[in-house]
Amino acid sequence: GAVWELWVAIADVSHFVLPGSRLDREARDRGNSYYFPTSVEPMLPEVLSNGLCSLRPDEDRLVMAERVGFDDRGIPRTSAFFPGVIRSRGRLTYEGVQEALDHGGELAGRHPYLKDAEALAHLLLERRQARGSLDFDLPEAQFIVNRSTGEVEGIKRRVRLFAHRLIEEFMLAANEAVARFLTEKGTPFPYRIHPAPDPDRLSTLFRT
């Protein structure tokens, strides 16, 4: 049976952006939100991206929710999906969560589930690595920009925290649960997969 229960909720954008609408066509044309050092060019209007579809603290928001149950080895055993309404209890930062995981403090006291989340993320990571998953952990550059002039004043390596990895593991687990559900239902759906490497190219890699 399940001994861990992971809940993931994402904003229900489809409630506001109907298929074929002007908003839908514009979002298709843009394809993405674009993040710059000092600004963001959103895929959707700000009233949605930073308002009605943003999970702000202490405000009711429409979501698509998912519940995944794991056994004590991190193997998924149950899953359920449903529309819902949530009220976020706080907007946390990666740095704040990492501080709470490492040293406790006020944030850890207000959100005691963070240590449970850390333990589950470690379990999922270990299981994924045992399955042969690769983690390149490539360095990411962070640009230091003068907000007055727009000029780049420096570049430094962005620090990758376990808080980042925690969210990565949970979103991977959530996406895999959706994929399993659709596969079991025989529902046609585009999957983004990483097939096994070509043996010749793999041999070349090892020689270099």
Where are each of the predicted segments found?
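Electropositive polyanion-binding surfaces
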Residues: G1-T208
